[in-house]
Amino acid sequence: EVNKSHQKEDLFLWKQADPTVSAAFHYLAAQLYKHERDFANFYKSGILYLAYVDCMTLGEDVAQELAVDLALAALLGENVFNFAEFLAHPISKFISKESKSEFGWLLDMVQVFNDGDLNAYDELCEKYADQLNAQPALVMHERKLREKITILAFLRIVFELPAEKREIELADIAVRTKLSVDGVEFLLMKTLSAGLIEGEIDEVSSKVVVTWAQPRILLKPEIQELADRLDQWIQKVS
């Protein structure tokens, strides 16, 4: 019994590892993934690294470089569809327009992806064409970026609806995503296969019924939007 007690105590101490060790581990992992151009795992490791360090102590140049790398990884990472961890973290301020960073356009782009706003995305692509073309990875993956923002535009439709009323006409999705109905069906299959939603496509009535959507971290404006919708619902039922 005494030995078991010591074993549990040792395990507890192991789990409470020195934050500097954890920071070093995630930093090295992030650098490895960056070298391998594994955007999704770099993003994950970079965010975990920031959980163990104060980005304000990194130095402005280092922090800005990390912010740029994370923003690019968020956009380019396979199956990275939640950007709130980055947008809500102080590291993002190092590429904000308020900080007079030349990469303010990149933060705008991440925000547009988080919002699932296709129209704003098209506007930014036109407005910041020179900056986008100066980033080879973004140019190389232009088609994937378009596919990703389109999926996010659809997810935005889903999140705007009450959980019990997520029956959506394919024609309505086509308008919001700028796709044909056939394109919408392909989009839905991609979204289902990525595990972002669960549901069924009713081809007879040209509808999709979404029974579950992957939870997402909300930013303050999105929380306020939910609160406003709740107030409206309370007013209707009272």
How should these model regions be labeled?
Residues 1-51, 55-238:
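Charged, E/D/K/R/S-rich low-complexity terminal regions of large eukaryotic assembly subunits
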